[in-house]
């Protein structure tokens, strides 16, 4: 058996066009990676890969007797996976620049804004997205997971390289970092959009979640952009002063708004950004910072910012009933809900109704906190189902309302009934009153008892608005 170093050296000497761990996806001159410990199974799929054009098989069981020089055997393949991926992904580095965006909230919006900014320069960029409505747009790829596994990522990267794209924009989730899905990738630029409590069902505690997010960044990174409106962003900056900072609160940042100017290291821009909420501005500044890092300049006309579009289901406005408004937003964390409600309170003079729930089989620690925020920041609340999945909706709601001491809320489990009731209440309120329907945003389904039921908040509200 060759050593790991010898295997990697041999791998570098072979002209490989791609790699996969699924024999169905093998193309000519691919490397096929077999993690199977079952010799018969490993041989079956490896032979299938060779028949389809694989040039080399990297396997956890020794197949040299059957595959001869087309087999690289490593009995410790699972533990050495990152080393092989680093070698295989290195071929992509020369052809495309990868931009990774992480954060508790704001990843999708930041990536979407950056994709549009790059289009101003007619730069060929792929946006990897798990928002179906966005995946229908030009130069996008749909992924069901925020951050897909290494092999699917390579598939998307190879496709982008074949299409001669120069940039690959992707969101990096804490699950993706922790599970090694981005192992081997060499990021040209990275961004932290925000950081607050979430996913403690998976990470178990806030410290673990924080450490995973922080591990995405290195003190040797040259192209980091972080929001310093959170403690993690400040810490990343303190440990790597080459990091560029953005803020909507602190003018010490490299990118911020001052009066009607966008201040950047590459010069000032007149502020034509069309969205006024602080969290949208913060996401945009992260995207603008990434653009500046890519080109070392901001070279488009500021007025072009007027053309920027927002993601569907992100603070999406529906005008109703004589100057009364409904917003649909994806806010499903305490920090996101607080940010949206602060924005609405600052903009509108009337009452605010907040309609929301919390996902089942997910971080339960945030439920009570979201209930308290909704009650503190709005005048009336309607608690309903989000995606209960297989968890008891009554248990979820009980955890949401446990610290809601004022009795200015209703519990309506059926989301359609809840939205209908919210619209009826809104109609009776004074002008400039708002109904916020939070939690699901763009989603086209609701998960109840393990089944996906077709449902979209925006569609349902538009169906009701003329009959309520």
Spans of model-derived segments:
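N-terminal leader/targeting and accessory segments in enzymes
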Residues: 1-83, 87, 272, 276-278, ...
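ATP-dependent carboxylate-amine ligase
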Residues: 1-13, 26-31, 37, 41, ...
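Short, well-ordered alpha-helix to beta-strand connector turns
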Residues: 16, 28-29, 54, 68-69, ...
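Short internal beta-strands
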Residues: 55-61, 225-229, 355-356, 379-387
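Acidic, Mg2+-coordinating active-site environments of NTP-dependent enzymes
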Residues: 59, 63-68, 163-166, 178, ...
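Short, active-site-adjacent cap segments at secondary-structure transitions
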Residues: 64-65, 133-135, 176-178, 231-235, ...
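Phosphate-binding loop of NTP-binding sites
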Residues: 81-224, 228, 234-242, 288, ...
């Amino acid at each position: 058996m060759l050593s790991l170093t010898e295997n990697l050296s041999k791998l570098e000497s072979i002209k490989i066009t791609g790699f996969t761990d699924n024999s169905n996806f093998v193309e000519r001159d691919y490397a096929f990676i077999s993690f199977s410990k079952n010799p018969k199974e490993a041989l079956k799929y490896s032979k299938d890969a060779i028949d389809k054009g694989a040039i080399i098989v990297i396997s956890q069981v020794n197949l040299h007797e059957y595959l001869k020089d087309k087999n690289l055997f490593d009995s410790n393949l699972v533990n050495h996976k990152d080393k092989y991926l680093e070698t295989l992904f290195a071929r992509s580095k020369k052809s495309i620049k990868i931009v990774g965006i992480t954060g508790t909230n704001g990843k999708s919006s930041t990536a979407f804004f950056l994709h549009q900014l790059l289009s101003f320069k007619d730069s060929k960029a792929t946006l990897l997205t798990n928002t179906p409505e966005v995946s229908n747009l030009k130069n996008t790829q749909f992924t069901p997971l925020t951050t897909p596994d290494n092999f699917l990522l390579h598939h998307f990267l190879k496709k982008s390289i074949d299409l001669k794209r120069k940039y690959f924009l992707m969101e990096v989730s804490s699950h993706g970092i922790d599970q090694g899905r981005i192992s081997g990738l060499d990021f040209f630029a990275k961004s932290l959009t925000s950081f607050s409590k979430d996913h403690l069902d998976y990470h178990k505690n806030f410290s673990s979640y924080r450490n995973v997010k922080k591990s995405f960044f290195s003190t040797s990174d040259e192209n980091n952009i972080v929001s310093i409106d959170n403690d993690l962003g400040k810490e990343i900056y303190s440990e790597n002063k080459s990091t560029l900072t953005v803020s909507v609160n602190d003018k010490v940042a490299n990118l911020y708004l001052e009066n009607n100017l966008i201040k950047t290291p590459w010069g000032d821009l007149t502020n034509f950004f069309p969205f006024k909420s602080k969290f949208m501005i913060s996401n945009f500044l992260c995207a603008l910072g990434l653009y500046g890092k890519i080109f070392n300049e901001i070279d488009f006309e500021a007025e072009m910012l007027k053309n920027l579009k927002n993601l569907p289901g992100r603070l999406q406005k529906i005008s109703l009933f004589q100057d009364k408004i409904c917003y649909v937003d994806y806010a499903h964390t305490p920090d996101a809900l607080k940010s949206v409600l602060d924005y609405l309170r600052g903009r509108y003079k009337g009452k605010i109704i907040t309609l929301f729930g919390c996902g089942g089989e997910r971080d339960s620690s945030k439920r009570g906190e979201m209930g308290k925020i909704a009650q503190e920041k709005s005048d009336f609340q309607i608690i309903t189902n989000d995606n209960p999945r297989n968890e008891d909706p009554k248990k979820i709601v009980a955890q949401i309302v446990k610290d809601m001491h004022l009795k200015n809320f209703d519990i309506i489990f059926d989301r359609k009934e809840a939205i209908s009731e919210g619209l009826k209440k809104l109609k009776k309120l004074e002008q400039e009153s708002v109904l916020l329907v939070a939690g699901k945003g763009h989603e086209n389904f609701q998960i109840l008892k393990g089944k996906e039921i077709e449902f979209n908040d925006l569609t349902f509200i538009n169906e009701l608005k003329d009959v309520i």
